[in-house]
């Protein structure tokens, strides 16, 4: 049962519109890593307050936290300098799963709340990709399965029960709503699905936060 959900614009965007820009900021500013770490931890703590309020609870009721992220975000939130990920060979400082007290990295929850970070895989294939693989389990199927996780960074997984391949590619700031006139992050009101009627070729779309589909004519005009 999902008791509450919340999201927030990535506050690190003021230090760079994409991942590599943020790493460049850290390289050029001695205090950069600390600023990015403080920004994301503050945002996460704000989300905890929102979630607790929506669930009619208190942040002290949060006992376990699971965290997944792309490698740069993973390193930043843990207080690890991400500069090694800014140039080849894009080496991770750590790829291990992490189990620690949330308070150790400044997260506001129950004083003894545990923080579980899934392991990063390699290079720019992070704990978010590991979470997708665990959830979808493409390595358990006889048939070949393609999983595409598109965000600020895109991971592509191709696997069956004999072999698993994964790669990563930057997608730029578009998926955070930057440098495009009508973009926004994946929150309520954003278009999440589009279907084309096979007979009429008319499109319809579904937005996050709504169970209804719309065939508003304006959408057709926008697409054309």
Protein language model features and the residues they cover:
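N-terminal glycine/serine-rich phosphate-binding loop of ATP-dependent small-molecule kinases
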Residues: 2-78, 84-87, 116
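Glycine-rich phosphate-binding loop of actin/hexokinase-like ATP-binding domains
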Residues: 4-18, 84-97, 131, 137-222
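Surface-exposed acidic, glycine/proline-enriched linker/cap segments
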Residues: 21-32, 91-119, 182-193
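Catalytic cores of large soluble enzymes that bind and process phosphate-bearing ligands
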Residues: 28, 32-43, 121-125, 215-223
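Predominant activation on well-ordered alpha-helical scaffold segments within soluble catalytic domains
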Residues: 45, 49, 130-134, 224
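Short, basic and Ser/Thr-rich N-terminal targeting/leader segments
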Residues: 61-63, 125, 150-152
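Alpha-helical architecture
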Residues: 68, 126, 147-149
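Conserved phosphate-binding catalytic cores of ATP/NTP-utilizing and phosphoryl-transfer enzymes
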Residues: 111-145
């Amino acid at each position: 049962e999902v008791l509450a959900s919340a999201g927030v614009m990535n506050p690190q965007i003021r230090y760079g519109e994409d991942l590599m820009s943020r790493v460049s900021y850290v390289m050029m500013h001695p205090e950069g890593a600390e600023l990015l770490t403080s920004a994301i931890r503050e945002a996460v703590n704000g989300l905890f307050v929102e979630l607790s309020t929506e669930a009619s609870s208190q942040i002290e009721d949060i006992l376990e936290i699971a965290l997944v992220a792309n490698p740069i975000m993973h390193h930043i939130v843990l207080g690890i300098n991400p500069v090694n990920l800014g140039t080849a060979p894009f080496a991770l400082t750590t790829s291990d799963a992490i189990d620690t007290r949330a308070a150790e990295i400044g997260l506001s929850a129950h004083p003894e709340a545990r923080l579980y970070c899934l392991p990063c895989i390699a290079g720019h294939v992070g704990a978010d990709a590991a979470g997708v693989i665990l959830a979808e389990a493409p390595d358990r199927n006889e048939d070949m399965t393609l999983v595409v996780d598109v965000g600020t960074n895109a991971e592509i997984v191709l696997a069956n029960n004999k072999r698993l391949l994964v790669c990563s590619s930057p997608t730029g700031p578009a998926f955070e709503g930057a440098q495009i006139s009508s973009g926004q992050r994946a929150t309520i009101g954003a278009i999440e699905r589009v279907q084309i009627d096979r007979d009429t070729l008319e499109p319809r779309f579904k937005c996050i936060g709504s169970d209804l589909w719309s065939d508003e004519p304006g959408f057709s005009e926008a697409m054309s």
